[in-house]
Amino acid sequence: MKKKLLALLLALAMVMAFAACGPTGGEESPAPGTQTPAASEPAGEEPGGEAAGSVYYLNFKPEQDGQWQELAEIYTAETGVPVKVVTAASGTYETMLTSEMAKDEAPTMFQVNGPVGLNSWKDYCYDLSGSALYGELTSEDYALKNGEEVAGIAYVIESYGIIVNTTLLAEAGYSVEDIQSFEDLKTVAEDITARKGELGFSAFTSAGMDSSSDWRFKTHLANLPIYFEYQDKGINSTDAIEGTYLDQYRAVWDLYINNATCDPAELTAKTANDALNDFVTGQAVFYQNGSWEYANVVGEGKLSDEDVTMIPLYFGVGDEANQGLCTGSENYWCVNKNASEENIQATLDFMYWCVTDETALQAMTGGEGAMPSGGAGMAFAIPFQAAPESSNPFVALDAEMTAAGKTPISWNFTTMPSEEWKNMVGSALAVYAADQTDANWDAVVSAFVDNWATEYQLANG
């Protein structure tokens, strides 16, 4: 009996000795916002194979919903960590984020559009300065900071301008070399309109003013008068815009709506899909949109790479011959610091996987056939060290123009004071399109200038 007891005690001592050499499992996790770099390294699964935590990503970009759903399924299959992706409809992200953040199961991963968006959500943002994701950035310039904290990380760099069907343009007797300024664009567009019956196509796609499409004009086109005013003043934000270049804004808007596939009075009923269909079915030569739209315009049953290119959004200001595309980001990933520690770590792990895993990187940067399912990838240019070159030719065009000495137009619409400001400008543009009087344009100017000061005060006190 004594021998058995002695053997049992020796065995127990050996087990305890081995246990002392391994992980204790009793270390406390740092509180949200105070992690060290080591604390945010990808954690993987817990011993025993049970996944820790879950991810809820509220996605901003409806055009990439399918790809994110597929990536979420792949990640869950590989790790066991549940990943839910919910995508807001175009123009509804802020409203949906506000609603979802009030719920018990709030998003663990969300995004803001830049400094103005961060101002609304900074109290929810986990400090990413010690995260593995932050360590993967190619430049600190892609980090969105709140004081010393890294509140958001840009996950895609994009460009927009005017997408051109070069085949149709050639049928009209022109090439992109003939368009080096706003006046050149106006001459070509108005000539196409004059010969529309003969040619069988229009100059521009419909400039839809429903919520799926109006952001192209109340935000992206509106960036141009803001950019040039900021350039004049040497500033990068303001509490009161003057509207110095709103005459040029009107000239471009007039060109779009009076040389398009539909009557200007119909624009409030026209959607993003209407404009896309105008373009891919050969009904229009010009389509204001961005690099994110590549997979929607090129591919099987659509146009070919040889059919399309992108030119700058000429505005009739400055050295237009040396103007580049409008390039920047309004897509910053943030992590909800009010989520549980397990869910925060699960979210950090998922984000890191997205920018380092071969399958995820191919999905984010690849084009036709890049998804494991065989579908088109997101064709993004992403600012992370492991990223391959994007297969998106619009991204390559931006790089080529910059290398040739052309100046990209920066994204200053991230300083627009509120979503309400954008909506008021959009509504005024739609009213003007239906009845193009000076009085109605004055209402656009008022929405742009007067409401900027009002909305800025409401947002900043």
Segments and roles (model prediction):
Residues 21, 100, 107-108, 129-169, ...:
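A structural signal for short loop-to-beta-strand junctions that line the ligand-binding cleft
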Residues 78, 172, 261, 300-370:
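Extracytoplasmic/periplasmic substrate-recognition and gating elements
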Residues 41-49, 112-167, 216, 220-222, ...:
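Hinge/lid segment of periplasmic solute-binding proteins
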Residues 147-155, 160, 186-238, 284:
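Extracytoplasmic/periplasmic solute-binding protein
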Residues 127-141, 204, 208, 226-251, ...:
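Short, solvent-exposed loop/beta-turn-alpha elements that line the ligand-binding surface or hinge
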